[in-house]
């Protein structure tokens, strides 16, 4: 069973000046508030509720095609004939014509369990995204969008 969701709009932000080293009075790095935006990425991710394993996919957007690519990753992880259950929200992408057409090519392979409307907090991955935001994304500065993508994968694959 997987808990799945998207985290869109993760900003790649670069500093415009050098950070100041900590002083004896203040043990933290000082950083100018000015920054340069390098773009955004969307994280499509699931957590295996039995093992805790994260399955990430980082893209520029989160379209039906991106969701299908994510489902293909899950499909490759299990032998043919196994049923893959996915807990997810009611985002329109999850029930689009493209997704339905993809699912029709492998009947019974995926079972979607939708959270109630306004009940996203019931999906376990929401807590994981909150922890990731606090531990890794808060205050992050990168030199490129690709560096942000690499750091997201490194965080999730540890």
Where are these regions (language model features)?
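Extended, low-complexity cationic-aromatic segments
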Residues: 1-65, 72
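Active-site proximal helix-loop segment of RNase H-like, two-metal nucleases, encompassing DDE(D)
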Residues: 125-147, 151-154, 158
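Hydrophobic "anchor" residues on beta-strands that sit immediately upstream
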Residues: 1, 85-86
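Short, basic/hydrophobic alpha-helical segments
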Residues: 65-84
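RNase H-like polynucleotidyl transferase catalytic core
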Residues: 29-35, 104-124, 140-142
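Short small-residue beta-strand/loop micro-motif enriched in glycine and branched aliphatics
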Residues: 52-57, 112, 137-139
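Acidic, metal-coordinating catalytic cores used for nucleic-acid/nucleotide bond scission
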Residues: 62-63, 86-97, 116-122
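Mobile genetic element proteins and their domesticated derivatives, centered on retroelements
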Residues: 3-5, 46, 52, 71, ...
């Amino acid at each position: 069973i997987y808990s799945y969701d998207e985290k869109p709009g993760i900003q790649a932000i670069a500093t415009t000046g050098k950070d100041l080293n900590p002083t004896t009075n203040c043990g933290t790095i000082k950083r100018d508030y000015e920054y340069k935006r390098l773009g955004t990425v969307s994280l499509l991710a699931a957590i295996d509720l039995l093992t805790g394993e994260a399955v990430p996919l980082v893209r520029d957007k989160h379209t039906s095609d991106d969701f299908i690519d994510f489902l293909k990753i899950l499909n490759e992880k299990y032998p043919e004939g196994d049923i893959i259950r996915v807990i997810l929200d009611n985002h329109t992408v999850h029930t689009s014509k493209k997704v339905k057409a993809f699912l029709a090519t492998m009947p019974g392979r995926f079972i979607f369990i939708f959270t109630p409307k306004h009940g996203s907090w019931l999906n376990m991955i929401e807590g994981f995204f909150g922890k990731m935001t606090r531990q890794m994304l808060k205050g992050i500065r990168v030199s490129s969008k690709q560096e942000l993508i690499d750091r997201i994968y490194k965080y999730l694959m540890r």
